[in-house]
Amino acid sequence: MSDTIAAIATPGQPSAIGILRLSGPDTCAALDAVFRAKNGRPAAQQRPRAMVLGELLDETGQVIDSVLCVRFPAPHSYTGEDCAELHCHGSPIVLDTGLRALFAAGCRQAGPGEFTKRAFLNGQLDLLQAESVADLIDAETAQQAHNAVCQLDGALSRTVARIYDGLMDMAARFYAVVDYPDEDIEDLQREQMLDTLRRAQNDLEALVAGFSRGRLLKLGVPTVLLGKPNAGKSSLLNALLGYDRAIVTDIAGTTRDTVEEKVTVGGVLLRLIDTAGIRDGGDAVETMGVERSRAAAKQASLALLVLDGSRELTAEDEAAIALANTVPHLIVAVNKSDLPRALDVGALADRFDNVLSVSAATGAGLDTLTDAIAAQFPAGESTGGALLTNARQADAANRALSAVAEARGALRIGMTPDVVLTDCEAALAALGELNGKQVRDDLVDTIFSRVCVGK
């Protein structure tokens, strides 16, 4: 990486502060062309990691802003290269003019995620940490941000490194046995190796098991609202969103198709799916809507079963209950608590663990519903940030787990060292893909292309 890159690192609309970022061997030379410090010293003589007041110049040397400049000499920088930032007033024209001046001084426009890619290639971050940068930028909830920053801090990386180092040490012993056939694995060594494989298998099983939670954390919990027509599903959707998203009328069967929206409830990101009321005998369009409701329930992790508290249970309610019972997590919301109660809530409490009263019309009980949702997906289960959050990570972890299980089984039944070694090598290769020690260049390019320009 012999060139120097530059980019605007802040959003492209007027704001209080805008930042120009650059990284590469010619950082100081580029700064001297566009920045004139008030203390008169060139960039290379400025104190590292200290803000310096000065003027930002355009390509002709005209002053365009009063700015602060901070320099991060290699290797103690984000990318591991010489880096700098120019903190300007957040005017798009100032930032664009400053960026053009940096290009005129020899910098190149940074590609998407190129600063983070350079950090990875220079060993400042491993691939898991680099991926967490994009997760942190895209975080919509405190849970998402917490998990991303834990991974950026190395929580997941340390878990993978511990597994990798244990397997590498064991593989080294097997190499010695394979290279020198007269050597043999003593019983004590065999037990130690089996223990290493057992711990590796347990750690990998925990990572793989956490993937489903990691995906829910990242993408949002698919949450389906189920109930008979006119139970108040759309009203509850609107109440949770805080605005009118779905059409609400007194006419049963108003909702014909699924309506989807994202909302953070109790710190949990939900992908709310309002569905057509569950009943038989509707027209062709309504029947199609009911089928889509059933399909949505199959994909959901949480069901909010909405019952009309002003009426007794009907066959249509029981049909909705049967469908809701197929979803892993279930909360029963007895709606219309502002009206006279006809539904036997005590009988419902005998059938379900989570039954609560709400009024979508007045907002009564929504706080209790929010708490119930948060209790289903508590932040405390985040395992300190050691959560796989994308399919690439899960695939590599699954392959590593399979190889470790094969190695453990082969060693237990006394297979020859070369067989066990082959499985260990497969596990190490998969773990190398997971943390970036062994990864294809095209995959690296794809991963970093998803990160925003300037990061």
Where are these regions (language model features)?
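Structural motif
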Residues: 89, 307-310, 336-337
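Short glycine-/small-residue-rich Rossmann-like dinucleotide-binding loops
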Residues: 241, 276-277, 301, 308, ...
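Generic enzyme active-site microenvironment
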Residues: 272, 306, 333
